[in-house]
Swiss-Prot record:
Family statement drawn from the similarity comment of this UniProt entry: Belongs to the IFT43 family.
The name this protein goes by in its record: Intraflagellar transport protein 43 homolog B
Gene assigned in the entry: ift43b
Cross-referenced InterPro entries: IFT43
Originating species: Salmo salar
Entry GO CC: cilium; intraciliary transport particle A
One Pfam family recorded for the sequence: IFT43
GO biological process: cilium assembly; intraciliary retrograde transport
Residue ranges, annotated region (Disordered): 1-107
Entry keyword set: Cilium biogenesis/degradation
PANTHER family according to UniProt: INTRAFLAGELLAR TRANSPORT PROTEIN 43 HOMOLOG
Subunit structure and binding partners: Component of IFT complex A.
Amino acid sequence: MDDHLKLGDSGVVKNVARLGRRGQRARQAAEQTSLEEPRHVRKSSSSTSMGEGPPPKPARRQGGWAEETSGSAKSGRRPAMVQDVEDRRLRPQTPQGSDGEGDIPVIPDLDEVQEEDLNMQVAAPPSIQVNRVMTYRDLDNDLMKYSAFRTLDGEIDLKLLTKVLAPEQEVREEDVGWDWDHLFTEVSSELLTEWDQGEKEEQVCVMRTSLPKMG
């Protein structure tokens, strides 16, 4: 047996020499695992016999997204003081003194605006064309000033007519208030004078016709 073990050891040594450092490390790791396995088996058997629970689970290593989620969870548990400070910073800041009553704009009512507009508006004067009638005076002035008016259409001469025209003072009659008694007497007197003249003319005619017969 000793020879066999020695031969085996010599063979192992040769193999180790052949394998190099990496081979030695692998061999040592294999021996350690082979030695630890019976120990674990013994411990598990003893723990089951004693009635103890299963061994504790090893702590899991977290990486990648897990770290970010954990960080966000921690940030969610920040104190309320920090959150209040951040909320105040994020709020829109209004200038001081803007809440005063003098800064509030006053919107006028619609009725007041309409009344002001009506007061400011000025009615335009009506544009009506009136045909102005010329008076006698205007006609006289035109007749005296413009000699071209004395000829109508350049052919008819109106000089004879202009010479005979009477002035305005002679043609215009004054406005006199009528009285019934005065008007009756004037009309009756004129009629009587006309009748008298008619009778006298008739008598003269009769006398003329009767004179030759008498001769």
